[in-house]
């Protein structure tokens, strides 16, 4: 009987100790979580990717391509992502990108022109923002 009482006492005490440890680990975070807000440039890049993915499909199907969307010109003045800088390198690459992008619409060899535009994207992203390079490479028309 004494052994039974000792066992119950030990179990009771050990259960109480775990409760206090659990309570200390369940504290609420003191910092408020902030949702990511994409910059104008990040949103523009996403729109251009979507458009070029659709353009890629049109080229493959030999459909009419339409014309260069005007919003592509916003690459020259869209607000950059925090920590990124609009410098001469970026401005030169942006100008070259717009040139290669616009050439697609009047080209006799749209596949080659399109792939040149993809090269232009990658050449800038290698220096400025490497994250989306693998995604951009998927635009190539083989």
Named regions from a protein language model:
Residues 1-7:
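Sec-dependent signal peptide recognition
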Residues 13-14:
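C-terminal motif of bacterial Sec signal peptides marking the signal peptidase cleavage site
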Residues 18-118, 133-142:
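Extracytoplasmic c-type cytochrome modules immediately beyond a signal peptide or single-pass transmembrane anchor
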Residues 117-129:
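The canonical Cys-X-X-Cys-His
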């Amino acid at each position: 009987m004494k052994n039974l009482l000792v066992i119950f006492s030990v179990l009771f005490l050990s259960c109480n100790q775990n409760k206090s440890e659990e309570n200390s680990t369940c504290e609420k975070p003191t910092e408020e979580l902030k949702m990511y807000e994409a910059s104008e440039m990040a949103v523009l890049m996403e729109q251009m990717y979507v458009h070029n993915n659709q353009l890629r499909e049109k080229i493959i199907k030999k459909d009419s391509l339409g014309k260069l969307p005007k919003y592509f010109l916003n690459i020259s003045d869209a607000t950059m992502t925090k920590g990124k800088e609009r410098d001469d390198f970026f401005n030169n690459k942006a100008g070259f990108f717009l040139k290669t992008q616009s050439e697609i619409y009047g080209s006799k060899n749209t596949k080659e022109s399109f792939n040149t535009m993809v090269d232009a994207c990658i050449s800038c992203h290698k220096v400025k923002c490497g994250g989306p390079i693998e995604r951009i490479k998927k635009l190539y028309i083989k």
